[in-house]
Amino acid sequence: MFGRSRSWVGGGHSKSSRNIHSLDHLKYLYHVLTKNTTVTEQNRNLLVETIRSITEILIWGDQNDSSVFDFFLEKNMFVFFLNILRQKSGRYVCVQLLQTLNILFENISHETSLYYLLSNNYVNSIIVHKFDFSDEEIMAYYISFLKTLSLKLNNHTVHFFYNEHTNDFALYTEAIKFFNHPESMVRIAVRTITLNVYKVSLDNQAMLHYIRDKTAVPYFSNLVWFIGSHVIELDNCVQTDEEHRNRGKLSDLVAEHLDHLHYLNDILIINCEFLNDVLTDHLLNRLFLPLYVYSLENPDKGGERPKISLPVSLYLLSQVFLIIHHAPLVNSLAEVILNGDLSETYTKPAQDVPRSSAKPSIRCFIKPTETLERSLEMNKHKGKKRMQKRPNYKNVGEEEDEERGSAEDAQEDAEKTKEIEMVIMKLGKLSEVAAAGTSVQEQNTTDEEKSAATNSENAQWSRPFLDMVYHALDSPDDDYHALFVLCLLYAMSHNKGMDPEKLKRIQLPVPSEAEKTTYNHLLAERLIRIMNNAAQPDGRIRLATLELSCLLLKQQVLTSSGCVIKDVHLACLEGAREESVHLVRHFYKGEEIFLDMFEDEYRSMTIKPMNVEYLMMDASILLPPTGTPLTGIDFVKRLPCGDVEKTRRAIRVFFMLRSLSLQLRGEPETQLPLTREEDLIKTDDVLDLNNSDLIACTVITKDGGMVQRFLAVDIYQMSLVEPDVSRLGWGVVKFAGLLQDMQVTGVEDDSRALNITIHKPASSPHSKPFPILQATFVFSDHIRCIIAKQRLAKGRIQARRMKMQRIAALLDLPIQPTTEVLGFGLCSSSSSSQHLPFRFYEQCRRGSSDPTVQRSVFASVDKVPGFAVAQCINQHSSPSLSSPSPPFASGSPGGSGSTSHCDSGGSSSAPSATQSPADAPTTPEQPQPHLDQSVIGNEMDVNSKPSKNSSARSSEGETMHLSPSLLPAQQPTISLLYEDTADTLSVESLTIVPPVDPHSLRALSGISQLPTLPAADTETPAEGAVNPEPAEPTEH
């Protein structure tokens, strides 16, 4: 035999090189099979290779030669495959045979060839063969074989698998026996097979009745019990995982539950009415209501019936409403949660209706009395007995009519008993409640259940589940339960199958509702309370909870025509927003990291809004909120840890509440983001570069490219331009990048070169920034190189400082003025206009006339009012110090954009913890005075001699000692309103207003000299370089 095998392999090889895919070769292989009908250790390899070769020839013949299948069918070659299996030839031959059959059916494309293979019922014989399923490899190839066959199902091929005369459907019944297999890939394959069968059954009434009457109830009841067992295991995992040690197992259990729900939804989507009725009834009465919903009212696990904890119940119900949209199911479930008063009626399993009934009448989570395999076998034998009584298969339709009639009767009986189980308590229906109470007492219930049913009789309108939902929202300690409640409300309101009238009845938000005049005040107050708690320094509200609260509140009160929120609720919301402003003020710093965090958080919030579906896929939120990042939980789903994360959280809370406030008030967002794309220079823009500072350079990119460009520095950006050939003095932008994201370093061996890198802002705080420019800039000499480096470095500092000022304006903080533009002191009107950036002339002109500019009053201004007066008058009286207002003035919020240099000077006179010394512009060319020290000295002097003249002298001396770089640019006109009855200037008098009549202005004719300051406050001559024109002091 061994010699024959060697001869066949050798001869086959030489022949295969000539024509291995041919009818002649198939005849030769048939001859080999006839000579080796018994499997032995010596010939099993030969048989396996022969089967493989036959498969290759069949696949080739399917595309090229139909005579191959004629010969295969004529010689009945499938019998050899079946005989090999029945000989118990060992796992090796079984595995190879199943693998070969799987490949064969996967690659057959012509239906005629498929009919040849499926004829004579040999495939069904292989399906029902008793394989050793304890072998994982055999199990894998077997279920894969069934899955491949199910994919070939259609209206024609289904008759080869389903025999309506014998009431047998081996492909389906053998597959569903593995619905609870421990291997997840096997369970997934079973679901695919059943879905393929259900889709085909829509066009085959006989098969549909078989599935409904013989398999639906046993399969769905066992499936529901299997899902519920997983849910109880999930709940136990949550309850025992105090240290987040079982997160891997918990994630697997949550993923399994999601797979179950998607599978159930796929069955319901097929829209097979018979199946949907049976499945919906089993899900409601055997799983969702007794296990999920009943656990909401009484989460105590001490009772006889299985229950799960409140957070797990809310979490799973949210998943149900997010995934399943079958209207009868979700409306029945929502009716119980929103309006139902449940009277639980449990009986023993022996008192249940028969398992063959289409409707289980008792609402409880119990284990089926029989296994699925046993139930299928019993139904199969019952069908055979009936077939013996009715040998004529044409009478099958009559039998189905009788079964359908009995099923309808059972359905009517079940609907009658529903009044015993659940009563929707409405006004004027107390008789129903009393009837329900008496019927409940007649059941075999526990004393606890009887007392609960008796108490329900006395209530006209009892909604225990809805009350629990609202109660879970009102938890001041943390948001553990609140997050799940919000997800449940969101899922119910966004469910496509939900009846809007059910939600409107209790005034829950309906996103599709165009017009609304009222909303749920209780829910709105709970949501605003969550927002207020989130804005507290010690608040334990996670960002995900806050964002979901804002989303639900907007759904409640916003309509297409406006906002219907009550003034009292809007006032409470504004109070929460103010709290968030104070919270961010606590973390406001002059450091660079705050600006980066501020922009990153805004970018993250706008680019990645909350997706509730993804949120409910995360098993980590089932665990109590933790504050450590070591768990790997996303930042928005846990509490902050450390100052950096607390800063990020405070910024995000501020953004959310600010956005919500603006939307409810119908106002547009005009101040965020800090960098607007429409205001930036873009590639291929054509700019007027006349009178602009340009530095010629050679740009050498990382890949070795070399181009000639001109370097121009703008307020926020650096640009590389080339001359425009059509207009003299104009340039075309070839690259533009933000100064704040730039890094400049020198080149060690070349004093004329700089290494410049500009990074693109990261999409998330954890991602690595991507460099959009990484090149070496070579200038003509080292002087131009130094100038370029200085201009870029100062431009970067200036850009970041201006954005910090805009953040300060958002937070209503005093603004320290930026008095330099790119390092050039504003010494004269000509020099200032010459060095202003080329991009922002129009914005400067709009700054003082912008109608959006509001007035701002800083409380620290009145400490040294004479200082502000002297500075203002000096600036207005000296034309050499006038210049346009900074560009950020036009966009500043809350009045801070119109803040004059008087306001700025006054605010800087008081030391503030919110300002950083790094904000003061310091350059080697222009030494800065110690402004805080001199002001403190002036205040001490004023406090020791409380006279009007000393106040004026201290303020005048402060102006005398300011360097040119500290003199602010000209701002909108200052009006110091004068009252004859006032002794001193008030805070309200120092306000930016439009120009007033001359007689209302205080006239200052002279300024006296500053008295000598203590030695500790004296300044060097270089620090007092500016000597304003003397003026006569005024008296009030």
Swiss-Prot record:
Principal localization? membrane
Query: In which tissues is this gene expressed?
Result: Ubiquitously expressed. Expressed in pancreatic islets.
Residue stretches of biased makeup (Basic residues): 381-392
Keywords, in A-Z order: Autophagy, Endosome, Lysosome, Membrane
Q: How does it sit in the membrane?
A: Peripheral membrane protein
Report the subcellular localization: Endosome membrane; Lysosome membrane
Report what the protein is called. Answer: Protein CLEC16A
